[in-house]
Design a protein with these regions (language model features):
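A general structural signal for short secondary-structure junctions and capping/turn motifs
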Residues: 68-71, 93-99, 119-121, 169, ...
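Class II aminoacyl-tRNA synthetase-like tRNA-binding/catalytic domains
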Residues: 2-120, 128-132
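Extracellular structured ligand-interaction cores
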Residues: 101-103, 124-128, 204-206, 246-248
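A translation/RNA-centric and nucleic-acid-associated enzymatic feature enriched
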Residues: 108-110, 180-336
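Generic recognition of stable, solvent-exposed alpha-helical segments in well-folded globular domains
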Residues: 21, 25, 29, 138-145, ...
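A glycine-rich phosphate-binding loop feature that marks nucleotide/adenosyl-phosphate handling sites
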Residues: 47-51, 166-173, 321-325
Length: 336
């Protein structure tokens, strides 16, 4: 999406007060069952990190983090996190987790360069989770099994809400459809990556698109991915069709994390081999951090989806352009 959409005739089924109650209902139920099914413990997480640590998520490599100096630390500069993709792997070691165990956090981030629309905001809130796996488990089956587990929790949450709210009907299919970006390119060669996502999501209802970041047959990647956390051969997005807006809606991005080989190859491909000298990257290369799988699940995204809202601003507090605020008001959307 490149601009906000205000569906004709849309009216929220819940007022502002009831929306707040419903948001808590969604979050409490989902995170409880996610933690149980993936064997995750909740931990405290940082809002900011030091740039020189290499722990921040560089996203596509062009987004600017919000930075500030710290007065009583000789004006040392810190930056607000974009996500905790790399920090979590470091934390699993520091906190003494074992193979088969994992952690999750309530992650808040500011992405100042985000192009905002119905599903994108400069404020990002997600469950960031990470789990230790063995070297032998770094394979496609582990990825798919974990995707199925996350998807099962999504379906269970939708069923729970459909019982509590009469207006919510179950729309998620029984199974999620798996496809790689290369297969998707073969299926829809004349379409853009976003168009491919839309058509496959609308056809299947729920889709797991795998292997994101590397170049496809046309010489371009399906989508941008930082080279230093996901293994581009072993990652995935969970995308569902969202009829309220007639869009493909990404609910989660996840993947098996880079090992030494994947990290060095991807840093080279991304044109930033110098990052290998950063502390986190050295730890991956030296294998002093565990092998892991992890991801992020958008809290506002799933609240928007399950509560059938037309704009993410209906379920989170953020700042929006004046024209969006004006159009929302005219359309009867109540942005928080």
């Amino acid at each position: 999406m490149e601009q906000s959409i205000f569906p004709e005739g849309y009216e929220s089924a819940l007022n502002l007060h009831d929306t707040q109650i419903a948001i808590k209902t969604v979050k409490d139920f989902f995170q409880k069952h996610l933690a149980q099914n993936l064997n995750l413990a909740r931990v405290s997480a940082p809002l900011f990190v030091l740039p020189e640590s290499g722990l921040n998520d560089n996203l596509n490599g062009v987004e600017r983090p919000v930075t500030f100096d710290i007065k009583n630390q000789a004006d040392r500069e810190a930056e607000i996190v974009h996500s905790l993709a790399k920090w979590k792997r470091y934390a699993l070691k520091k906190y003494g987790f074992s193979v088969g165990e994992g952690l999750y956090t309530d992650m808040s981030a500011i992405r100042r360069d985000e192009i905002v629309d119905n599903v994108h905001s400069i404020y990002v809130d997600q469950w960031d989770w990470e789990k230790i796996i063995s070297r032998e488990d770094r394979n496609m089956e582990t990825l798919k099994d974990t995707v199925r587990t996350v998807y099962k929790v999504l379906r269970k949450t939708e069923k729970y809400l459909s019982i509590h709210y009469d207006y919510i009907q179950e729309i998620l299919p029984g199974d999620i459809f798996f496809v790689t970006t290369s297969e998707l390119e073969e299926m829809f060669p004349d379409y853009t990556p976003k168009e491919r996502e839309y058509y496959i999501a609308k056809a299947k209802g729920a889709v797991c698109i795998m292997q994101i970041g590397g170049r496809l047959g046309n010489g371009e990647p399906h989508d941008g991915r930082a080279p230093d956390y996901d293994d581009w051969a072993l990652n995935a997005d969970i995308i569902v069709y969202y009829p309220v807006l007639d869009i493909a809606l990404e609910l989660s991005s996840m993947g098996i994390r880079v090992d030494r080989k994947a990290l060095l190859e991807q840093l080279e491909a991304a044109g930033c081999p110098e990052r290998a000298e950063l502390p986190f990257h050295k730890a991956v290369i030296d294998e002093t951090v565990p092998f892991t799988i992890g991801g992020g699940i958008g809290q506002s995204r799933i609240c928007m989806f399950f509560l059938r809202k037309a704009h993410i601003g209906e379920v989170q507090c953020s700042l929006w352009p004046d024209d969006v605020m004006e159009e929302a008001k005219k359309s009867g959307l109540q942005l928080l």
